[in-house]
Design a protein with these regions (language model features):
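Noncatalytic linker/hinge segments flanking ATPase motor cores
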Residues: 48-51, 64-69, 81-85, 141-150
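Extended, solvent-exposed segments with strong compositional bias
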Residues: 55-95, 107-114
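Short, surface-exposed linear segments at secondary-structure transitions and domain or protein termini
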Residues: 45-48, 61-73, 122-136
Length: 171
């Protein structure tokens, strides 16, 4: 992990608009800005067939996958809709299939004009089923301040046993 990027300790299955989403938070610890930041999430899950175990890889489409600049923090949101590989899944299935979500973040350090690529992952036991992040900002002296100690803060919310299957129906 790149020590200049901070990541939330847990990724969350969180309410989003009228449905649910998979979310994680990251923050820029640098004194310089990260520009043209781009994020990709990949879900890896194990399946068993007659040949044995195999790993399946799925792209998780983000609500917003790039920002022109990352001055403070960014909450990455994958809406769980009918096209999501997480549609209809339960937490027990995530555990059984040893789910892991891998984040790849690319950007350019504005101060040094040097490309930054960093990876971070969340295993099933680092995911919280039914929670939402608590705001990590406060307004001080007329400007927004990020409190890195609050980057991972979340509160539990009631969640369905399974994520919606995309038809607005719980599977």
């Amino acid at each position: 992990d790149d020590l200049r990027i901070a990541y939330s300790e847990h990724a969350l299955f969180a309410p989003f608009r009228e449905g649910w989403s998979f979310q994680l938070r990251l923050a820029n610890r640098r004194s310089t800005m990260l520009v043209e930041a781009e994020a990709r999430l990949m879900l890896v899950m194990a399946d068993v067939d007659d040949q044995g175990e195999l790993l399946n890889y799925y792209n998780l489409k983000l609500q917003l996958d790039r920002v022109s600049f990352l001055p403070l923090s960014w909450t990455l949101v994958h809406p769980i809709d009918g096209d999501s590989p997480l549609a209809g899944i339960s937490y027990d299935e995530m555990v059984q299939r040893r789910a892991e979500v891998i984040l790849v973040l690319k950007g350019t350090d504005e101060g040094y004009m040097q490309q930054v690529i960093t990876r971070h992952s969340y295993r099933y036991d680092e995911m919280v089923w039914g929670a939402r992040y608590i705001r990590a900002f406060s307004a001080r002296k007329g400007s927004m301040q990020l409190d890195l100690d609050k980057l991972s803060d979340h509160q539990r919310v009631e969640a369905p046993e399974r994520m919606p299957n995309g038809q607005g129906v719980l599977a």
